[in-house]
């Protein structure tokens, strides 16, 4: 092999190795990006507990959400950014509608679509509601007004949402005595 042939060959090998390294780095970094559901879960984990937020004198953004809600998942990044900007001035609270513990709050705030955002002043009084997937600018304008104790510019704003209705009827099985096996047999159905 001559010296002229080895230089292009080495250059080609170096380029192949560099391309492989770049692809490897991109794959590793890409796999580390949290999914929207993971971001929603981490937001909920880091949120101020409802009991704490309702007892203090700070304004609050109360979000009703569900893990399965695609609009909630899409909003997770915007909420995380807003939390970074506003967490020194207000509390961010997240209540999962799939947790029966929050049924009284779901009913109190008339949650009929998610995500639903309730803006509460420092005294815990609702100042407005926004429902669905909303632009960050709408949420930010409402939060600015909330911390300044001004009227919210975008109350009753509605974006894409996931419909929700609370099942207010107790399940049929809970109406029977748990010691009775008759609650397991349906009329006209034999095994």
UniProtKB/Swiss-Prot annotation:
GO terms for cellular component: plasma membrane. Its main location: membrane. Disulfide bonds join 69-72. This is Thiol:disulfide interchange protein TxlA. Residues 165-191 are annotated as: Disordered. GO terms for molecular function: oxidoreductase activity, acting on a sulfur group of donors, disulfide as acceptor. SUPFAM superfamilies: Thioredoxin-like. It is found in: Cell membrane. Residues 165-185 have a biased composition (Polar residues). The keyword Disulfide bond applies. CDD domains: TxlA. It is a single-pass membrane protein. Required for disulfide bond formation in some proteins. Acts by transferring its disulfide bond to other proteins and is reduced in the process. InterPro entries: Thioredoxin-like_sf (IPR036249), Thioredoxin_CS (IPR017937), Thioredoxin_domain (IPR013766), TxlA/HCF164 (IPR044241). Residues 27-148 form the Thioredoxin domain. Belongs to the thioredoxin family. Keywords: Cell membrane, Disulfide bond, Membrane, Redox-active center, Transmembrane, Transmembrane helix. The keyword Heme does not apply. The chain crosses the membrane at residues 14-30. It comes from Synechococcus elongatus (strain ATCC 33912 / PCC 7942 / FACHB-805) (Anacystis nidulans R2).
